[in-house]
Structures are given as C-alpha cells and as structure tokens.
From Swiss-Prot:
GO terms for biological process: catabolic process. InterPro entries: Flavin_Rdtase-like_dom, NADH-dep_flavin_reductase, Split_barrel_FMN-bd. The keyword Oxidoreductase applies. Pathway: Aromatic compound metabolism; Xenobiotic degradation. Its EC number is 1.14.13.166, 1.14.13.29. SUPFAM superfamilies: FMN-binding split barrel. The gene is npcB. The 4-NP/4-NCA monooxygenase is composed of an oxygenase component NpcA and a reductase component NpcB. This is 4-nitrophenol 4-monooxygenase/4-nitrocatechol 2-monooxygenase, reductase component. GO terms for molecular function: 4-nitrocatechol 4-monooxygenase activity; 4-nitrophenol 2-monooxygenase activity; FMN binding; riboflavin reductase (NADPH) activity. It comes from Rhodococcus opacus (Nocardia opaca). It catalyses: 4-nitrophenol + NADH + O2 + H(+) = 4-nitrocatechol + NAD(+) + H2O; 4-nitrocatechol + NADPH + O2 = 2-hydroxy-1,4-benzoquinone + nitrite + NADP(+) + H2O; 4-nitrocatechol + NADH + O2 = 2-hydroxy-1,4-benzoquinone + nitrite + NAD(+) + H2O. Induction: By 4-NP.
C-alpha cells in the first residue's frame, strides 16, 4: 500500500511562503474592484473574487484591509467588479501598484455607485449585504445590482504571472451551461 506523501503535512504548521506557493497553483481571473467615497475614486487589482449564488445574484470579494479601496467600500457599501480582458495586463499592474495614479489615462464611466472601467471585458456592480474579517483581509458579500459582459477572452493569473485562457476543446465535453445544469430528476 502506498503512503500518501501529502498526509505527512496535515498536522504540520504551514509557513506563509509555502501557503502562497500552494494557493498560487490555483489559476484565477483578474479584476479591478472600484468604488468611490466622497467623490474620490478608488481601485485595486483583485483576484480573490467569486460568484456565490444566482438567486439572488451574489458575489464574494476579498480585499486587504490596508487598501484605500477597502475603506471606500466599507463606507460607500457599493463597488464594481471590472473583469479584465487578456490584453489588459498593464492595467492590472497599474491598479496593483501602490501610490500609482491609477485612474490617469483610463476611460471611466462615473456611475451612481462609483466608477466603472469603460474598457473592461465585463462588469458587475454590487451592493454590500454583509462583510466579515478574515485575517488581513475583509470578505465582502454583495448582491449584484447590474451586470454586463462584452466579448473576448479574460486575463488570467497563475503563480504570480498574468496570462491568457486557452479553452480546451474536446467533443466529448458539454460546452454550454445549460448542458451542465443539474437535473431535478
């Protein structure tokens, strides 16, 4: 019988570098989360974003509590998730850089619930319904109040690098969400 090599790590303390290495193996999309408070726009590149449910449409967003965007969302209680396209790595880098003039030379629609990046691949405007602390971050639970998707491919993030998504083509796999839906039978 083979010994599970991962079993030996189950009860061992996990150091920060090893944790970051392991979670870095999870590929994700790249977003810029924007908000405004007192007329000042804020934005940050965030990959810790996920859908929660579709009835009602809800998302989870995790932000470092040291970010100005975090403070703006806590006060405004609204934000927009701008999903980036594969050609927007430089924009993601700008919004990930502390101290950068993030909105310079960026086309922005100033909306009722804060700024939305005009060139985003897709966006979801959200209203915060709950938030909780998670270590250095805050987890925002939000209801989506407006959403729109364009065309194109998303920017991806994997092991500390930006890249693009290449769909796997296999005729045996179902390709539509309707085909993958769970049957009530």
């Amino acid at each position: 019988m083979l010994e599970d090599p991962m079993k030996q790590n189950v009860l061992q303390p996990l150091d920060k570098a090893e944790f970051r290495n392991v979670v870095g193996h999870f590929a994700s999309g790249v977003t810029i989360v924007t908000a405004a408070h007192d007329g000042v726009p804020y934005g940050a590149t965030i990959s810790a974003v996920t859908s929660l449910c579709d009835t009602p449409p809800m998302v989870l967003v995790c932000l470092n509590q040291k970010l100005g965007t975090h403070a703006a969302i806590r006060k405004a209680r609204h934000f927009t998730i701008n999903i980036l396209g594969e050609d927007q790595a430089s924009l993601a880098h700008t919004f990930a850089t502390p101290g950068a003039d993030k909105f310079a030379d960026v086309a922005v629609h100033h909306r009722q619930h804060g700024p939305r990046l005009a060139e985003a691949l897709a966006y979801l405007t959200c209203r915060v319904v709950d938030d909780l602390e998670g270590g250095t971050h805050r987890i925002f639970v939000a209801e989506v109040v407006e959403a729109q998707a364009g065309t194109g491919n998303p920017l991806s993030y994997y092991r500390g690098r930006f890249g693009h998504f290449v769909p796997y083509r296999n005729a045996m796999w179902r390709t539509t969400q309707a085909d993958n839906a769970v049957s009530p039978h």
